[in-house]
A protein has these predicted regions:
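Conserved N-terminal subdomain of the carbohydrate kinase-like
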Residues: 1-55, 59-69
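Short hydrophobic/aromatic-enriched beta-strand-loop microsegments
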Residues: 1-2, 70-73, 154-156
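Short, acidic/turn-prone active-site loops that include or flank metal/cofactor-
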Residues: 4-6, 75-77, 158-162
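Short, charged, surface-exposed secondary-structure boundary motifs
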Residues: 10-12, 79-84, 163-167
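Structured loop/turn residues at beta-strand edges in well-structured enzyme cores
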Residues: 41, 99, 130
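Conserved beta-alpha-beta core of the PfkB/ribokinase-like small-molecule kinase fold
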Residues: 45, 49-125
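Conserved phosphate-binding/catalytic region of the ribokinase-like
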Residues: 63, 88-91, 95, 120-175
Length: 175
């Protein structure tokens, strides 16, 4: 289903010497999703790959959680646009949304912003205590950690022959 928007989100990524760090500008911003424009979509699993904090409201998250398994990438929930610049935001009321999320994908920075923990196991346990059923934490070259039903599963990273651009690695993992 195509949901019309006045614009499509358009980012400019600016990288320095460290490919794991970037700054971003938003040159165009799409309209947020609403219950009305998502209401008739039926699926077993809904994945929210949000780009910015206001893409999906708490009401939309609650609504979709009643229709099927709800998966989300925390990335977009933790950044907002001021002017054209993308800025990290604190968890605000995002903890409220977590109890409706079945599967949550975060990276190391996102887990720390959400939980205050820099230890992946502590962060995963905290997210689960807040209601997330399955926590996926990407750890860059160290692979990833999955926490589900009280158990940890470590997945090693696959070393590439050459790193050209790290853009989209988290999105690819979530897919």
């Amino acid at each position: 289903k195509i949901i019309p928007s006045r614009k499509t989100v358009y980012f400019e990524n600016i990288y320095g010497d460290n490919p794991d760090e970037r700054s971003q500008r938003v040159l165009a911003k799409a309209d947020p999703f609403t219950i009305e424009n998502l209401g008739d979509i039926e699926a077993n699993i809904y994945h929210l790959g949000t780009l910015l904090a206001d893409d999906f409201s708490l009401e939309v998250i609650k609504h979709l959680s009643t229709k099927g398994i709800l998966s989300a990438d925390a990335q977009g929930y933790l950044r907002e646009v001021r002017g054209e610049q993308v800025h990290a935001i604190k968890k605000k009321k995002k903890q409220e949304a977590l109890k409706y999320i079945d599967v949550l994908k975060v990276n190391e920075k996102e887990m720390e912003v959400l939980t205050g923990y820099d230890d992946p196991e502590k962060a995963a346990r905290q997210l689960a205590e807040w209601g997330v059923k399955e926590v996926l934490i990407t750890l860059g070259s160290l692979g990833s950690l999955i926490y589900a039903e009280g158990e940890f599963y470590r997945i090693p990273a696959f070393p590439p022959k050459e790193v050209v651009d790290a853009t989209g690695c988290g999105d690819t993992y979530a897919a």
